């Protein structure tokens, strides 16, 4: 399973989950920067793999150890990026300090506020407006002209599939969503 779109949004216990292998890029909700990711593999599925490839670092520069290394050593690249490991550790500690229950609560507030605001402005697909719960990623109706206006106002957005993606994380505020909604309303009335 891909945890990129989930990890960092609420508490998650890999061992208690029904997932055997989880991979994730850590740049998104985990806030650990680009080029950072990991895999989690449950002990019970490791014997289903016959991994052959190793890097020099996997065997600590001694190829004679190739048959005695642990499962995870087969998954290591040739050169490990200790700076990225430190960034990931810092990000995980930062989120732990805030508390993932607080992150989740803030995301729920932001999602409700954005869902209401964008629905009232008729900027969402009908299927989205009917949802009781939605993520904090919204694809609003809009063209390149609207995208450029948002960008000019220092609002981070991305053109996506004929619309404009707006995403919010715990560090965003409901007031920021209100500002965006006010601008969108003003621009639509012109």
Stretches found by the model and what they are:
Residues 149-190:
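PLP-dependent enzyme catalytic core of the Aspartate aminotransferase-like
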Residues 17-60:
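Active-site PLP attachment segment
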Residues 44-82:
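Acidic donor-binding loop at a coil-to-helix junction in glycosyltransferase catalytic cores
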Residues 9-10, 31-36, 168-171:
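Short, charged, surface-exposed secondary-structure boundary motifs
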Residues 1-21:
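Catalytic PLP-binding core of fold-type I/II PLP enzymes
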């Amino acid at each position: 399973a891909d945890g990129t779109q989930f990890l960092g949004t609420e508490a998650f216990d890999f061992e208690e989950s029904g997932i055997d292998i989880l991979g994730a890029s850590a740049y998104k909700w985990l806030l650990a920067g680009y080029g950072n990711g990991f895999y989690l593999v449950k002990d019970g599925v490791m014997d289903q793999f016959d991994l052959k490839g190793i890097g020099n670092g996997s065997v600590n520069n001694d190829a004679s150890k190739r048959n005695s290394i642990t499962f995870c050593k087969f998954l290591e690249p040739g050169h490990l990026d200790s700076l990225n490991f430190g960034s990931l550790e810092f990000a995980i500690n930062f989120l732990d300090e805030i508390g993932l229950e607080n992150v989740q609560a803030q995301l729920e507030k932001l999602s409700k506020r954005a869902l209401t605001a964008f629905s009232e402005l008729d900027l969402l697909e009908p299927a989205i407006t009917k949802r009781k719960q939605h993520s904090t990623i919204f694809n609003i109706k809009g063209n390149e002209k609207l995208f450029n206006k948002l960008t000019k106002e220092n609002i981070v957005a991305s053109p996506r599939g004929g619309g404009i993606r707006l995403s919010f994380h715990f560090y965003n505020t409901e007031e920021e969503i209100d500002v965006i909604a006010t601008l969108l309303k003003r621009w639509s009335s012109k």
